[in-house]
Amino acid sequence: DKFFYPELSALAEVNAMEARSMNRNPTPWNNVNLTALRIGSLNCAGLQAHYADLKVDYSLLKADIIHLSETSLTGLGDCQYPLPGFDVDHCVVGNGKGVSTYYNAKIAEQKVCLQLIKGDNFQISKVTLPRVDSINVYRSSNASIPGTLEALKKLIDEEKPTLVSGDFNLCYKRNPSNTLTARLLHDGFTQLVEDATQIQGGLIDHLYWRDCLEPIFEVPVVERTSSYYSDHDTLLVTLAEKSIS
């Protein structure tokens, strides 16, 4: 009988590749063994147009909270655009505007409240949880920056960890000192996104994070994916609480 044996160097390389694989080394977003709050933010370029795509966006669906902007809903009728395992609240304004927030059963049990701010040219959603608040903003390019900032500031709890996400239509690279960003940074927030988020090269999708003076959370881990159905990147934030020593 003849036997075939693997080349030892080839076998060693296979084992090395396996050790480096994503299955063995999942990112925080994909690590099922990591207890954390996962928040996804995406300009979906129209919820009705891309509803079927969202239902199979398995990376985004790992979120506990999904913030969608520029949903372009003109009305709901009998369709709430449900995602399996999620509740949803929509802020319906019209074409090229609007935000929707989906949250899973774990969040529904904890949720203190959900607020929606419906401006003509900006919309804001806030999910209040016992330990952290998650705020999402869609600001049209012609919206008043001071007006958007004023509405946002009214929703921010100065004593609580807060994540602010969304499409601000303000390029952080070209205009990092804009009034809204400058004020949030002055108030102790950190802008977590460093690279362009939109296909034309603008960094217009922002993530602002501020913890308590005595931090409750580890430094947020930001991951991103490029969805085929939107010209914006999806921003995925993993928030893990600090272990009590």
Across the structure, where does each feature detected by a protein language model lie?
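N-terminal, active-site-proximal structural segment of metallo-dependent hydrolase catalytic domains
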Residues: D1-C79
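Surface polyanion/phosphate-binding segment centered on an Asp-His-Pro turn
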Residues: D1-N15, T162, C171, H186, ...
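Active-site-proximal beta-strand elements of phosphoester/diester hydrolases
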Residues: A36-G46, K126, P130-S141, S165, ...
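Conserved beta-strand elements of beta-rich interaction domains across eukaryotes
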Residues: G46, S72-T74, K106-A108, R139, ...
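Active-site-adjacent loop/helix micro-motif of nuclease/hydrolase catalytic cores
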Residues: A49-D53, N142-L149
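Metal-dependent phosphoesterases centered on the DNase I-like endonuclease/exonuclease/phosphatase
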Residues: V56-V93, P146-L213, S227
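Beta-strand cores of modular interaction/reader domains in eukaryotic scaffold and signaling proteins
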Residues: H67, T101, D133, L163-V164, ...
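Structured beta-strand-rich core segments of catalytic domains in phosphoester-bond hydrolases
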Residues: T71-R131, V137, P215-T225, D233
